[in-house]
Every structure is written in C-alpha cells, then in structure tokens.
Amino acid sequence: MSSQNSKDRISAKTRSLKPSGIRKFFDIVAEMDDVVSLGVGEPDFDTPWAVRDEGIYTLERGKTFYTSNAGLKELRVQICKYLERRIHVSYDPLHECLVTVGGSEAIDLALRALINPGDEVLVPEPCYVSYTPCAILADAVPVAIPLKAENEFRLTPAELEEHITPKTKILVLPFPNNPTGAVMERGDLEAVAKVCLEHDLFVLSDEIYSELTYTGRDHVSIAQIPGMQERTIVINGFSKGFAMTGWRLGYCCGPADVIGQMTKIHQYAIMCAPTNSQYAAITALRDCYGEVVEMRTSYNQRRRFLLHAFAEMGLPCFEPFGAFYVFPCIKEFGMTSEEFATKLLEKERVAVVPGDAFGESGEGFIRISYAYSLDQLREAMERLGRFVKGLRGR
C-alpha cells in the first residue's frame, strides 16, 4: 500500500502560509547567550495579585467545569459594563458578547463567520501578523493597505478608498497599532467611518492595546461613531492591559446576528474559554484597574526614555502614542530590515524585530518593544548606539 508524501498530506492552503517572521527570528535568539531581547510583545509585569488569587481560589473550590459556550454570564456582564465605561458603547451581554481564547480567536471567528469565498479583506500594514493568514484560512482575499510614516502610520480615507473594490467586505482596523504604536483619533475614525458607510463595509476593530495610550490620548473606538456600532466587531482581551497573556482570554462584542454565528463556530472548535481564566477576569475588570494605570505609567516612562535615546543617536522615529512599541527608521544604512536586525544581533547581541515581518510597508524599520525594564532598555540602547555609530563610520 502506497503512502502519501508530506506534500500530498498537507492542504495547499496551509502550505501557502508563511511562518511568522517574528518567531523565526527568535528561534535564532534562543540559541544565543548574552542577548538583550526587545522583541517580544508581552508585558513584563506579573498578573495583578488579586487576579492570581481568584484563579487559585477557583481551582481550590473545584470550579473547573465547562461554562456556557459564550462564557460566564457574570463575566460578559462585566465586559459590557467595562466597554460602556471606557468606550461609551452599550452591548447586550446575553446576545452581543462572546468570550474567546484570546483576541486572536475572536479575529479568526469573525472572519470565518462573515466571509464568503473570494470576499476581500482590507488589512492596513504594518500590522499584527495574524490577520492575513486568518483571512486566507477563511477563504478570503487579503488586500494590504500600506500605511505611511509621514501620516504617523494612521489610515487615511484616501488610502482606504483607493483599495476598495466591488468584492471588498471587511476592513481590519488594528489601533492602537502593533508594531508602530500609532493611534487613530476621533477625527481620523470619523473620516474612515464615512467611507465604510458609503461602501457598506464591515469593520473588525482590534482594540487589544486600548488601555495603553499616552499623553492624554484616550482610546477611541470606531464603534462610537454614529452608524458604526451595527457594522463593527470590537475585539479586545486581557493579555496586554491586564498582563494576562498566559491566561488566554479575550472577547468580542458586536451585532447579535454575527456574534451568534461566531459563537456557533466557537462551540464546535473550542467549546468554551478556560473556566479558571474567566473567573479571574471578572476580578480583573472589577477590582484591578488601578494596576492597569500603574503599568501604563511605567510604559510611558520607558517610551519617553527610548524616544530620547533615538534622538541622541540621530535615529528617526515618529512618536507613538499607543501600545508598547517604537518603530524607528533605519533606511539611512542601506540595508534591509532583516539585514539590520541580523547584524545588530550578531555584533551587539540585541534582538529586535525586522519591520518587514509586519508587511512590506514595514521595510526600512525595526520594531522595539518597551515591555522590558529600564535597566534592560538602557543596556540595549547603549549597544544599539554603538552599532549605529559603527555603521556611520564614527
């Protein structure tokens, strides 16, 4: 009996997906010593103690059974209260809210619930690496919208209009942005919303970094704009703002008909998000906002330190007002982002992420995360400054 070779065994769609440029680079880092890594987008803070304590308590009390597919009712109520308080949009916790395994699952579910084969999904780049693969797996056609540094990597209505075709169905709106740290203010969102309404586009608004904005720029959701709540899925979670990456808990809110279909897919693929994490998240939303503010204050201190360091070494970098990343430009050195990152790693043992890992428009930039201590950032900037001087021949 003949056996299939590996190529025949694996679907063509899966084979077409490229491995994450971030993970590929950090597989190399894992084999090296004395590396200061600024590449991972994960808070360096411990999960707030009250959240951990609730997790321990629920385990001790044996609260380890399935929840409803959509998640604990009490958690969904708290999520909807939180969103009403933070973005001033009201949702029905019973029909318009779904608890997911991280925000990433919510992205996947939304695309699978909305897409018919051949529909186009607009993806502003540079961006988080999962949108395009998830669109492909949902049988959509991802269409990149290259964002520009001169616009502070914000999406303009003209850029959006330019990429709309009769097949366009969904716009992914990833702000505050990973990797650039860009934010969209209300005026920006109103202009984008006007285009979405004119062309009947649905929006996936990935707001996972909504709690991490600086210098008084409060996060604004496109769901706040008149006419947009009924055509927007708001995606968020606990990983970034509450330092709960390993708890794997996210959520989405939107129109009941779409959330219902997403819940159906979630039911068959996942059943429910981790029960222990759900109980802990109730405590996070109810009791731990003070810790979120403290973490945000610390991130802002680090952000300002890095911007000052780049100015000192003459490395161009627009000021990011969200997330915990900076995206300096390295075009002056006449090498690709990957070449720059590789040489920096080899010569100075500093790990950053090449900008093109987040899309072609990220070429010529590197992503640096400031979810690290000031001591680590100081050491990294000393090494980076030395590396830049060497490239300039000084």
Show where each model-derived region lies:
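PLP-dependent class I/II
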Residues: 1-16, 28-32, 36, 40-58, ...
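Conserved nucleotide-sugar phosphate-binding/catalytic loop shared by glycosyltransferases and other
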Residues: 62
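Intrinsically disordered, tyrosine-centered linear signaling motifs in cytosolic regions
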Residues: 65-66, 209
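Conserved N-terminal alpha-helix of the aminotransferase class I/II PLP-enzyme fold
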Residues: 66-101
